[in-house]
Amino acid sequence: MDMQSRIRRLFQASIDTKQQAMDILAPHIEQASLVMVNALLNEGKMLACGNGGSAGDAQHFSSELLNRFERERPSLPAIALTTDSSTLTSIANDYSYNEIFSKQIRALGQPGDVLLAISTSGNSANVIQAIQAAHDREMIVVALTGRDGGGMASLLLPEDVEIRVPSTVTARIQEVHLLAIHCLCDLIDSQLFGSEE
């Protein structure tokens, strides 16, 4: 297969996964946006975590809220728990890598805050511990997962929201996660500041 054909195949696989996910995920993304907006209206904040590409997604989400998404508006409170290398390495060194997010949540999380927990497999041990810590702090969890939801899915409470991408391919799951994050940012802005359409 020549390279351009391979590129077209990858584009088509991404398109197919997004089309399959659209109707399945729309109600879950809507519900997640309502949870987040309710928290923001009640002086809550967003915390976000994940590993690798999912860490990048957590940072992307928090930066879109803190700075701006597609229009000028006031900054919104969001913290990516993936960015402080001194904190991450001290917790990993002194305790366990599995606690790098949960210890931060126990310090920063408040009742009514929202945790955006991201894992393509749903089985990242440190994200699972983050969900447990969020529940201990009476936070609501929005979980971005894939495959069968993994261990994260079994931890979620009725008030939590899972956005589970219907795919087993990590790259496709990540692509839909990013689109879901952009949908959340758009919905948050439109609910808080009105639609620009």
Swiss-Prot record:
It catalyses: 2 D-sedoheptulose 7-phosphate = D-glycero-alpha-D-manno-heptose 7-phosphate + D-glycero-beta-D-manno-heptose 7-phosphate. One of its GO terms (biological process) is D-glycero-D-manno-heptose 7-phosphate biosynthetic process. Zn(2+) binds at H60, E64, Q174, H182. Pfam families: SIS_2. Its cofactor is Zn(2+). Residues 36-197 form the SIS domain. Pathway: Carbohydrate biosynthesis; D-glycero-D-manno-heptose 7-phosphate biosynthesis; D-glycero-alpha-D-manno-heptose 7-phosphate and D-glycero-beta-D-manno-heptose 7-phosphate from sedoheptulose 7-phosphate: step 1/1. Binds 1 zinc ion per subunit. Its EC number is 5.3.1.28. The reaction produces a racemic mixture of D-glycero-alpha-D-manno-heptose 7-phosphate and D-glycero-beta-D-manno-heptose 7-phosphate. Belongs to the SIS family. GmhA subfamily. Catalyzes the isomerization of sedoheptulose 7-phosphate in D-glycero-D-manno-heptose 7-phosphate. NCBIfam families: PRK13936.1. This is Phosphoheptose isomerase. It comes from Pseudomonas putida (strain W619).
